């Protein structure tokens, strides 16, 4: 049985830390043996059972045989490459498209240097990183949805 240490709420230093939002839960159950012997094996066995059940209930389908004389009108990449495909498809110059794709990781590398004065972990207290993340997520979704549409409707997503 695990021994739990209760916090002394009459301690002025602890009260000052809690008032600043610096409190952490150091007083819960230890990871050994509770999580390592009981929780982790259940999660691993449950995940394995779910994977086996999905493999049995929905086996992989083999597609129709390839016909080299009948190609589709527009060949689309896999779903995770839709945003990159849309960048290359919508920009008129190939070099401009490659530079736009290269600017994405470079911009992500620069985010920690832009906000290096802010040491908080809470996303609500890190406005630059949160704004960059939300903007990047929305642009990626917009590009990904637009890549599945025809070129004339792809930039407006067919709304206008």
UniProtKB/Swiss-Prot annotation:
Q: Localized where?
A: Cellular thylakoid membrane
Q: Which Gene3D superfamilies match?
A: plastocyanin oxidoreductase (1.10.287.980), Single helix bin (1.20.5.510)
Supply one GO CC term from the record: plasma membrane-derived thylakoid membrane
Q: Name one GO molecular function term.
A: electron transporter, transferring electrons within the cyclic electron transport pathway of photosynthesis activity
**Topology in the lipid bilayer:** Multi-pass membrane protein
Q: Please cite one Gene Ontology biological process associated with this protein.
A: photosynthetic electron transport chain
Show the SUPFAM superfamilies listed in the entry: a domain/subunit of cytochrome bc1 complex (Ubiquinol-cytochrome c reductase)
Task: Output the PROSITE patterns linked to this UniProt entry.
Answer: CYTB_CTER (PS51003)
Q: How does it assemble?
A: The 4 large subunits of the cytochrome b6-f complex are cytochrome b6, subunit IV (17 kDa polypeptide, PetD), cytochrome f and the Rieske protein, while the 4 small subunits are PetG, PetL, PetM and PetN. The complex functions as a dimer.
Function according to Swiss-Prot or TrEMBL: Component of the cytochrome b6-f complex, which mediates electron transfer between photosystem II (PSII) and photosystem I (PSI), cyclic electron flow around PSI, and state transitions.
Q: Which HAMAP family match?
A: Cytb6_f_subIV
The record's annotation in NCBIfam families points to: cytb6_f_IV
Give the family this protein belongs to, as stated in its UniProt record.
Belongs to the cytochrome b family. PetD subfamily.
Q: What is this protein called?
A: Cytochrome b6-f complex subunit 4
Give the originating organism: Desmonostoc sp. (strain PCC 7906) (Nostoc sp. (strain PCC 7906))
